[in-house]
Amino acid sequence: MMGIFLGIVAGLAVLFLLWLAAMGTRRGERQMALFRQYRYAHRGLHNIERGVPENSILAFRYAITGGFGAELDVHLTKDKRLVVAHDSFLDRLCGVHVRIEEQTLEELRKLTLQGTKETIPLLEEVLPLFCGKTPLIIELKVENGNYKELCEQTCKLLGTYRGDFCIESFDPRVLRWLKKNEPFILRGQLAENYTKSGAAPGFPFLARLAMTMLLPNFLTRPDFIAFRYEDRNILPVRLCCGLLKGQEASWTIRHQSELEVAEQAGSLVIFEGFLPKKRAEQPAASEQSQQGAA
């Protein structure tokens, strides 16, 4: 009996070590150090109550004025243009039931954001705003399996960009593509606790479990893990970003107290809905930038 017990323990130990090996990150310490110097306004420094919609040129300008980087979302249109918007269907943002991937840029240009005069920007219009100023976290939004085209078009555009940026996605295929084709681009795996009720509907439980346990890292070797703040204390995150010293990013931070907890743990912070208190190495936000915050 003792032999069986020891065999089980040894087997579990081996599985645990294999899991640790699988979830490791690339550890680009020097490159990630730059990104840790900034905080990142989620979809820009937006505040619709003050006429500043999310993922708009105006929201990005306010973020830069405040000394913040920004996280933004990129979709590929029907005519292969890269536009900055979070939702694929535009009911919430523009009040019309159309899908970005089924529209041309000309068709999208006729729409306005959240009742304002702001329109959906192209990624190529946003990049010059940040170049030489603050970094960008660019999330690629895969729809209907278009990850390859989305990656190709994005990297083609970024190939001439001289600002600081990294790419993240919920879809591991994006990171796998980057690892194979653009290994020098910093890449991050977006994730959350998919085993919770309501998370990632439509995906089999085993697939959701594998994503929660960060198993795709074995194939993608991300530079950082961007995990939902509320889920950051689950075992896979603490092992990957604590024991293995992987870089963590926390989304979406909505209170100063959450920001302080995340930064104390060494996490990048993606915030929304408030203006963070300044820290010693970051200049105070100007009066203009405060107009874009809650």
Region locations from a protein language model:
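Phosphate-group recognition and catalysis centered on beta-loop-alpha active-site segments
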Residues: 2-294
